[in-house]
Amino acid sequence: MKKYILSLDQGTTSSRAILFNKEGKIVHSAQKEFTQHFPKPGWVEHNAQEIWGSILAVIATCLSEADVKPEQIAGIGITNQRETAVVWDKTTGKPIYNAIVWQSRQTVEICDELKEKGYSEMVREKTGLLIDAYFSGTKVKWILDNVEGAREKAENGELLFGTIDTWLVWKLSGGKAHITDYSNASRTLMFNIHDLQWDDELLDMLTVPKSMLPEVRQSSEIYGETIDYHFFGQNVPIAGVAGDQQAALFGQACFGEGMAKNTYGTGCFMLMNTGEKAVASEHGLLTTIAWGLDGKVNYALEGSIFVAGSAIQWLRDGLRMFKDASESEVYASRVESTEGVYIVPAFVGLGTPYWDSEVRGAMFGVTRGTTKEHFIRATLESLAYQTKDVLCAMEADSGIELNTLRVDGGAVKNNFLMKFQSDILDVPVERPVINETTALGAAYLAGLAVGYWKNQDEIKAQWHMDKRFEPTMEAETSEELYAGWKKAIEATKAFK
């Protein structure tokens, strides 16, 4: 009896295996962290073999601890840290260099060169992205340019490229399936999101041979099966793939045009489903593919906030203001307001809609009466203000007024933050019962492909709310607070 769907959630710091049942509930999960490599300042790399090892370990742990047999798995869904690039040898299956992580800035010079050559507009039109070190394309070029013999091997068709999803499907299938899905392909800087294919002009710009690239498939279909020696003698369908943020949008059942979710992790990622049309952004958002399903493609607008949960970690570890992140809520609630204090946590620059990598963090409005409580509250409020910046851009680009924001991620446990978020947006905020929406989204995509779930309506019915936060703040007050934030942003940008 095929009782479960196994979701593999390959993140930036750890890999997880999560078993879901028919009700979309978590049966069991296992997690394993892996090593972060920082060869030079600003560079971030992972060992792709270690990632693969961590995936095998969490699968084994999860199944054995849950006492679930491999033959009880109906299908496998994969969700992954996006943009991270792996290049490996087709014959040996060994990576020729570490995986270059999405956060890594080692290709900034390549990006500057491409911008100087005037490619920005073409890239924007075809991919919906900006020329930035964040995306995979320049990482692949860097590997081909910097690893001895790599370019020659690539030209001879001896190397393969993949984002993490591609690498894992290739390994699980014993090298039989070299695929990615629309959502991951749309983050590479090499994929035309309108024609839905790898783009020759973009590949020429990056000097990446087409033979390296995976086949691009829907986010929900059977790509292949696990090879028996990697899955305890069983051939289980690998049937769903989506990048982490798109998987979360699916896991939140944001299937309708204009529905949006915000994930509060290390940073924040807000995605709005724009239906079957790609909306070009005039306000610093990315246009991306949400998923491909049943022969149709859904698009999304995406806003990225670089510092969210990491600002709370900074209060805990850097400033030692509390021992546990959950205490931030207690401190913030002890004061009525920040008394005019604003904190702009631009520790690594500002993301959407500013896209300023030079700017650094700042604080404003500090007086002799400012206390630890004010400081903590101002830091939490900064997450909500940054989210409003993104939402304003989304509403302006899409012409859609948001009526509810669904939220997930670590920081959503903080009731103070969620209530303030609702107040400052003047929109209800809904927190789901199952916060593991990324893994759930991948499970749903796989389950639909193997007939474990019938359709999206069945999935929609499984979405249950834990708590709804309603806005109660006077409009005048929230407008005044937000105007102060905008002033703080302008002042921060001026100080370089």
UniProtKB/Swiss-Prot annotation:
GO BP term, example: glycerol-3-phosphate metabolic process
PTM note: The phosphoenolpyruvate-dependent sugar phosphotransferase system (PTS), including enzyme I, and histidine-containing protein (HPr) are required for the phosphorylation, which leads to the activation of the enzyme.
Recorded catalytic activity of this chain's protein: glycerol + ATP = sn-glycerol 3-phosphate + ADP + H(+)
Protein name: Glycerol kinase
Pathway note: Polyol metabolism; glycerol degradation via glycerol kinase pathway; sn-glycerol 3-phosphate from glycerol: step 1/1
InterPro entries in the cross-refs: ATPase_NBD, Carb_kinase_FGGY, Carb_kinase_FGGY_CS, FGGY_C, FGGY_N, Glycerol_kin
Function: Key enzyme in the regulation of glycerol uptake and metabolism. Catalyzes the phosphorylation of glycerol to yield sn-glycerol 3-phosphate.
Sites where the protein binds ATP: T12, T13, S14, T266, G309, Q313, G410
Protein EC: 2.7.1.30
Binding positions (sn-glycerol 3-phosphate): T12, R82, E83, Y134, D244
Assembly mode: Homotetramer and homodimer (in equilibrium).
Residue positions, PTM Phosphohistidine: H230
Signal peptide, first to last residue: none
Residues annotated for ADP binding in this entry: T12, R16, T266, G309, G410, N414
Gene Ontology MF terms: ATP binding; glycerol kinase activity
Family assignment from sequence similarity: Belongs to the FGGY kinase family.
Keywords in alphabetical order: ATP-binding, Glycerol metabolism, Kinase, Nucleotide-binding, Phosphoprotein, Transferase
Binding site for glycerol: R82, E83, Y134, D244, Q245
